[in-house]
């Protein structure tokens, strides 16, 4: 009715602007969508502006008409970013899309889940269920924070190529750091589970991503040498978790013993065994069970740690860093060194405290995280 009233009262002699502020705060999701789909006033004389945080509205919105407003790092200036600015040109020249517009493809792809791309402060793109399930669990267990707490969106793109999604992050479009996580599937001589074709595809994928985004400061790619499952179990400290998954899944003791022996044997045997277990269980369920086995001895593989550092470099505030430091220190037996570090993480200069933590606990996973972070600064 308000739309009808607005149409009736409009003045043809002036510009008419209608502003709708955060409809999700007042109306149900389904009504939001209906409102948006049926929001039709004459384009000749009226402009409609809608502000929203709703992923449901971004799902039905034409991405060509979406702008993202963000407060810059100095907290005084807002910047407006258009996700599709020069996007079709990029698709045509860089991705060689002949008869397709990249913006149209993305419009069809962006559902309520993947619209997190537009609202997250940083993004990690992954290609499978295993990464989507295991990475958030590893971060929470290792550092005591969730990806949601720091505004990092982890998106499982499934069978969609990374380059189509990552293209919205650039100087011309969204100013968000985006980490691409993918497997190289490197060939393993003597393995019965390895494929030369998969290894070739891994090299081709790396070359393509490095070429496309090598000069894009907002996007970087991080590669598992083999696969998530293999790179995870290659860390000695992580093998006990995989052993527990084996004990949990299989009932025959001979099968359990064989897999556990292989996990701690040669690399080829470990490679074949862990991929067999993941296939038997299904990679998503394997990651789910594995997530429940994690404890404070966990080691996050380097490529995942670096991807987390890259995506979070704009959002790791001082309070978050202090929270992480205290969480990690709580895992240690209390002594004078640990007590002093806790005190400094509470009230000390954060940069000096990080340096002291790294000097006194050089083998801690958090020290490796801090070092990766320093390399980007």
Identify the meaning behind each predicted range.
Residues 14-17, 44-49:
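Loop/turn-to-beta-strand initiation segments
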Residues 47, 60-68:
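Conserved catalytic segment of ABC-fold P-loop ATPases
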Residues 72-377:
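Acidic, divalent-metal-binding catalytic cores of TOPRIM
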Residues 51-54:
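H-loop (His-switch) motif in ABC-type P-loop NTPases
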Residues 34-35:
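Conserved hydrophobic alpha-helix in the ABC-type ATPase nucleotide-binding domain
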């Amino acid at each position: 009715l308000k739309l009808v009233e607005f149409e009736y009262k409009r003045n043809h002699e002036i510009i008419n602007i209608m502003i709708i502020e955060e409809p999700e705060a007042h109306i149900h999701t389904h009504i939001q969508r209906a409102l948006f789909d049926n929001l039709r006033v004459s384009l000749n004389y009226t402009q409609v502006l809608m502000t929203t945080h709703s992923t449901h509205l971004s799902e039905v919105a034409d991405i060509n008409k979406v702008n993202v407003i963000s407060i810059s790092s100095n907290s005084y200036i807002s910047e407006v970013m258009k996700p599709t600015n020069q996007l079709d040109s990029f698709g045509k020249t860089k991705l060689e899309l002949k008869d397709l517009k990249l913006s149209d493809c993305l419009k069809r792809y962006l559902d309520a889940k993947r619209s997190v791309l537009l609202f997250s402060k940083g993004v990690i793109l992954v290609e499978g269920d295993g990464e989507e399930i295991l990475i958030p669990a590893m971060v929470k267990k290792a550092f005591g924070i969730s990806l949601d707490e720091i505004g990092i969106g982890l998106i499982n793109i499934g069978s969609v190529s990374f380059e189509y999604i990552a293209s919205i992050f650039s100087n011309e479009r969204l100013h968000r750091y985006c980490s691409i996580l993918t497997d190289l599937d490197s060939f393993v001589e003597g393995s019965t589970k390895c494929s030369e074709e998969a290894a070739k595809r891994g090299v081709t994928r790396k070359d393509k991503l490095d070429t496309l985004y090598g000069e894009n400061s907002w996007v970087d790619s991080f590669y598992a040498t083999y696969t998530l499952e293999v790179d995870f179990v290659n860390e000695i400290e992580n093998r006990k978790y995989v052993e527990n998954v084996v004990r949990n899944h299989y009932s025959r003791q001979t099968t359990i013993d064989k897999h556990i022996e292989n996990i701690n044997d040669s690399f080829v045997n470990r490679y074949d065994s862990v991929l067999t277990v993941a296939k038997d269980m299904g990679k998503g369920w394997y990651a789910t069970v594995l997530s429940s086995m994690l404890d404070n001895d966990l080691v996050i593989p380097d490529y995942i740690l670096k991807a987390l550092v890259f995506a979070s470099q704009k959002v790791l505030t001082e309070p978050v860093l202090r929270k992480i430091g205290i969480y990690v220190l709580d895992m240690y037996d209390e002594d004078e060194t640990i007590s002093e570090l806790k005190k400094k993480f509470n009230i000390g200069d954060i940069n000096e405290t990080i340096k002291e933590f790294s000097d006194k606990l050089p083998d801690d996973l958090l020290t490796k995280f801090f070092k990766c972070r320093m390399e980007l600064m």
